[in-house]
């Protein structure tokens, strides 16, 4: 009997010890907190998305180049628009970097050369920097500017990406410590095409003209020359207001994580509406992929996870399914608006082409200007344009 009692005591003790030390973890209490969007990790810095075209625009900002700078301001969006579409109509994402050279306000030790923006798809940033440029006489080291752009910028090594340096100026091309041959060879070694554009204003010399023709030969391009003092006229169309309204609606569909909103330059760039670039800007921006827009990331399958606390207000209180449904709905709306803008722009371009033929005295935008030289020159040097 005593043996049975000891056996029962030992068994009870074993059960107690098991319950004490091997108890399964308690189930966490359920909460009503919404789940996080299920995708990977939101990066500390939102990286630029993949691009198809990279362009470094290098402008002479010496004292005689006010006209060149103004043409770049009014035609930047037009030039980018040209590069966004391939011959078969495929859309491409374009990144632009801006340099200035030949300005006495710049550091002599830097060769009177300054990088104003990295290669970026934030074209509003490029626009704002263009409007900040002020001309002033200085040494114009064009080959050195090309060399710096090749070495300093984050060029994509993928062969499928078109890479182009556009440099415009009016003084002798061979000035400075870097030879033209060295600059063009360095660009070629890095699979970067170079398009020299000579600014043939009243002060340009025959010696300078000859040096830019030689530069075009070294670059393997046709010689391009512009009149930097030509005033660029713009024709309105009956479709402009509708394009701007559709673009406004497109902007309303975008969703940003907390701290990752739209470009800090967006509002300032929009202030240049009165300068005649608003419609071109709307068309270009409707085609560009925006790496900070959660809707765009979702639609392209590149959306990464966003902690609930960083979600914008319209998503934070929703369940995970409701979040996905909302992004899907906005993505569909974006695609619809982009298509409508493309159709309106096709009608706009057709209308403007027709108007230009009806006005014999009208000098179309870009004839003898930076825009036209860029368009014709790019066709000659880029493999997929």
Please state what every model-predicted region is.
Residues 61-66, 101-107, 135-138, 170-175, ...:
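Solvent-exposed loop/turn segments at secondary-structure junctions
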Residues 60, 72, 98, 146, ...:
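DG-centered beta-turn motif at the end of beta-strands
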Residues 49-63, 124-132, 304-310, 316-320:
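Acidic/histidine-rich, surface-exposed loop or edge segments in extracytoplasmic proteins
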Residues 3-6, 15-56, 62-70, 85:
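Acidic, polar low-complexity linker/tail segments
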Residues 171-218, 238:
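VWA/integrin I-like adhesion module and closely mimicked acidic/polar interface patches used
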